[in-house]
Amino acid sequence: MRAILAGGGTGGHVIPALAIAQELKNVHGAEVIFIGTQRGIETRLVPAAGFSLKLVKVGALNRVSFSTRIKTMFDLPKAILESRRIIREFKPDVMIGVGGYASGPAMLAARLCRVPTVIFEPNIYPGFANRLVAPFAAAAAVHFQETCKHFRQCTVTGVPVRQAFFNLPQRRADGRRNLLVFGGSQGARAINNAIVEALPQLYAAIPGLHIVHQTGEKEYETVARAYLDPLVAAEVSPFIDDMPRAFAEADLVICRSGASTVAEITAAAKPAIFIPLPTAADDHQRKNAEALVDAGAAKLIPQSELNAERLVSEVCELLGNSTSLEGMSAAARKLSHPNAAAEIATMAVGVAGKTKRAARV
């Protein structure tokens, strides 16, 4: 069997796609390649994982300037033709579109070549590329039940995350209250600024508070200076290499609400305060966060309302109430999907097999 995974751009698209690819390769013996763009994180992550990456030239259509949209419209036919060439050379049995720049043209090319397609949509509201190809996809794998209204043949599989998030070591009983803060791999200035401003009040209000703070590369030195007080217990770094360990120690997490982060929160069963990125396409981060808030697993602070006072109030309320934290943790655990990669891979294999059987009839 041969499969193409198409799309990328951000870690939220690429990291789950790699988990699906590994499952297809290791469990189903599939030969797998990726279609992406030069501008996405897939150029680094996909080859590093041992998979071939084919590149097409296409940009964004949604939430971009008029000139960028016009340029993308001109690039789109060429990207479809290039994707069709890749498909004809590789001869896949199925294509999985994971959203992002390359997903739309590649999935349209698959339609032209009569290759069956599966959509993977990690966000509660589908991205533009997945909405574009939804009418002809054979199946869709999603994270939230609400997302199914946008697709035919939809299955709630969850988002693949590393198994380590499901198998966290027991939190040690050391009397500390541990707060984990991060804004994604690049950090988040709004979150950094609010935390720095809130530090004196947080440490005064919460005895034994310990903060682990991922700042992002650009703001590390500025943020780290705020933690220089020898009485402040903290670990500050531009990037956390062992995020499962950081999750294991955390009583509460403050973070954005991209699809992968939300999936990791549920896998680790950690209470969270989400601060959605307001510029995210289709406001999907807010919608992701609201799904967990509605389930009782998280709190939400809009970035427009984020300040030191609001942050201190929310953090103190939660860290001062173990019953609330335990309830949020239990609610998050109910939303987790430990077998997501296996379910999506099995779905793709089933779609490919069904098409082959139909062709023989």
Curated annotation (Swiss-Prot):
Where on this chain does UDP-N-acetyl-alpha-D-glucosamine bind?
Answer: 10-12, 123, 162, 185, 240, 285
Q: What does this protein do, in the record's words?
A: Cell wall formation. Catalyzes the transfer of a GlcNAc subunit on undecaprenyl-pyrophosphoryl-MurNAc-pentapeptide (lipid intermediate I) to form undecaprenyl-pyrophosphoryl-MurNAc-(pentapeptide)GlcNAc (lipid intermediate II).
Q: Where does this protein reside within or beyond the cell?
A: Cell inner membrane
- CDD domains under this entry? GT28_MurG (cd03785)
Reactions catalysed, as given in the entry: di-trans,octa-cis-undecaprenyl diphospho-N-acetyl-alpha-D-muramoyl-L-alanyl-D-glutamyl-meso-2,6-diaminopimeloyl-D-alanyl-D-alanine + UDP-N-acetyl-alpha-D-glucosamine = di-trans,octa-cis-undecaprenyl diphospho-[N-acetyl-alpha-D-glucosaminyl-(1->4)]-N-acetyl-alpha-D-muramoyl-L-alanyl-D-glutamyl-meso-2,6-diaminopimeloyl-D-alanyl-D-alanine + UDP + H(+)
Q: Which pathway is it part of?
A: Cell wall biogenesis; peptidoglycan biosynthesis
Query: Which protein are we looking at?
Result: UDP-N-acetylglucosamine--N-acetylmuramyl-(pentapeptide) pyrophosphoryl-undecaprenol N-acetylglucosamine transferase
- Principal localisation: membrane
Name the GO terms of the biological process aspect: carbohydrate metabolic process; cell division; cell wall organization; lipid glycosylation; peptidoglycan biosynthetic process; regulation of cell shape
